[in-house]
């Protein structure tokens, strides 16, 4: 853990941990909401929140020095990290599309 603190500044470390904690709360609330509703747009939105937590967890593990993947199509950017950053947005877009279709906005 000392290497982790030496790689990042104190402010970056606190921000990363706060983002992880806040997204964990969002995931808990998403799981509670998932038990209450089963519409397509809600499920896509909840999946986006879950994917966002995975992206934060991946960023935390990567910053802590854990190398999860070795394949990098672009130097410095892993395929897993790239996918985890874009997947929540894709889920949110799908949720909005289902909402527009359902309510004919």
Swiss-Prot record:
Subcellular location(s) per record: Cell membrane
Membrane topology per record: Multi-pass membrane protein
Annotated TM spans: 14-34, 41-61, 80-100
Keyword Membrane: yes
Top-rank taxon, per record: Bacteria
GO cellular component term of the entry, any: plasma membrane
Keyword line: Cell membrane, Membrane, Transmembrane, Transmembrane helix
Protein name (record): Uncharacterized protein TP_0679
Organism of provenance: Treponema pallidum (strain Nichols)
Lineage: Bacteria, Pseudomonadati, Spirochaetota, Spirochaetia, Spirochaetales
């Amino acid at each position: 853990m000392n290497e982790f603190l030496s790689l990042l500044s104190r402010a970056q470390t606190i921000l990363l941990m706060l983002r992880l904690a806040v997204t964990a709360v969002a995931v808990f609330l998403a799981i509670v909401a998932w038990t209450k509703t089963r519409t397509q747009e809600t499920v896509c939105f909840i999946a986006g929140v879950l994917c966002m937590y995975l992206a934060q967890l991946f960023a935390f593990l990567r910053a802590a020095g854990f190398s999860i993947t070795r394949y990098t199509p672009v130097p410095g950017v892993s395929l897993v990290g790239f996918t985890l950053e874009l997947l929540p947005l894709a889920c949110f877009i799908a949720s909005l599309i289902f909402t527009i279709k359902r309510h004919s906005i």
